[in-house]
């Protein structure tokens, strides 16, 4: 899809003009101009009750005298001054549905005139593009009959302000990164294993002059003492690989990097602590943290942000066999702390703890890890907010700000010292689980023991990384949040 921002005349020929209208006869400048061009036709529709402005209601008009456009699509925007982000998304999706049904190839949108609460034109355009790209996404790689795709080729926003051009640039890059994250996450686990994840990182680095790649294999992990990471991998024939993508683009090449760490369990059966069979297929999504870091690295390379950023994809697979690690095992982690394994299905934190120690070598400005870590986070926050745990208030607030700006929502959970009590073991420095209560928090508390040398935040995306039911599939979250956070570091 090609997106443009430019001033257009209402008399310009096009497949379709999209126009927003509020309830209670609150009309925009363009509405009144079109009404004049069509000799009062739009006001006649209002008087007859056919055009109410009700939220996401669409009225499609064809071949209107006075307009060169083939069609005029009017969409209801609810009450003026009360339009929320969620309602705006409904409007965009309603418009997109009609455009697809009418095989529209080019559209000129006057939705730039819509007023959103606490949002500017930049946000209006960027969010519209991200919504369009997200809604149009199809994953039919393995279907013999491909899904019908939209023929829409050109989407023109009626404005020529500089904000609009930046919004298009950001939205295109972020949408590309989200798509990349969704594509990898939706791949079946018989194809997307740790080696596949490393191969995708290699392809990304080879296609970008700004990115370089180092892959750490099991032999190197063993030399480094990454015993917790390796223990998780022991039950699988697919070997573990940790892919380290480096984006070195700050004016000062020696500036401390921001490090993103993504949990990459390409399939998690739970190991010896085997998961229930129901919905186990969804455990291919246990690598969505790595997928989101991959998508974010792709995005920032496309945007050419003047930052130094390192993205680590911690690829691994957790399966049961005669060589698998067991409940009761005690592991010596890379930083020397010992961990008693009480549940082999609490494996993500074991992979992450060694990865978080590994990244100390980069002397990072800060580290953010992203993981589908706990079902407890889904119980606590549902599927709308990612869980945020951090030892640094400024970092946590910056991530929450980015979440608000993008509507890629997050909610901060507490991390007081009392939660460490639940992780005590009579036989080791730590237990890998902290009991039934506060599971999302105790998982974060566990990780905090391996982050003493830098500013750190943890995003638990177990509830937000994928959807179930009819719309089953990866969401690409939190690529938008992470990218916005990085954009804000430049400002």
Swiss-Prot record:
It catalyses: Release of an N-terminal amino acid, Xaa-|-Yaa-, in which Xaa is preferably Leu, but may be other amino acids including Pro although not Arg or Lys, and Yaa may be Pro. Amino acid amides and methyl esters are also readily hydrolyzed, but rates on arylamides are exceedingly low; Release of an N-terminal amino acid, preferentially leucine, but not glutamic or aspartic acids. Its cofactor is Mn(2+). GO terms for molecular function: aminopeptidase activity; manganese ion binding; metalloaminopeptidase activity. It is an enzyme of class 3 (hydrolase). Its main location: cytoplasm. Binds 2 manganese ions per subunit. The active site is at 275, 349. One of its GO terms (biological process) is proteolysis. The keyword Flavoprotein does not apply. Its EC number is 3.4.11.1, 3.4.11.10. InterPro entries: Leucine_aapep/pepB, Macro_dom-like, Peptidase_M17_C, Peptidase_M17_leu_NH2_pept, Peptidase_M17_N. SUPFAM superfamilies: Macro domain-like, Zn-dependent exopeptidases. One of its GO terms (cellular component) is cytoplasm. This is Cytosol aminopeptidase. It comes from Haemophilus influenzae (strain ATCC 51907 / DSM 11121 / KW20 / Rd).
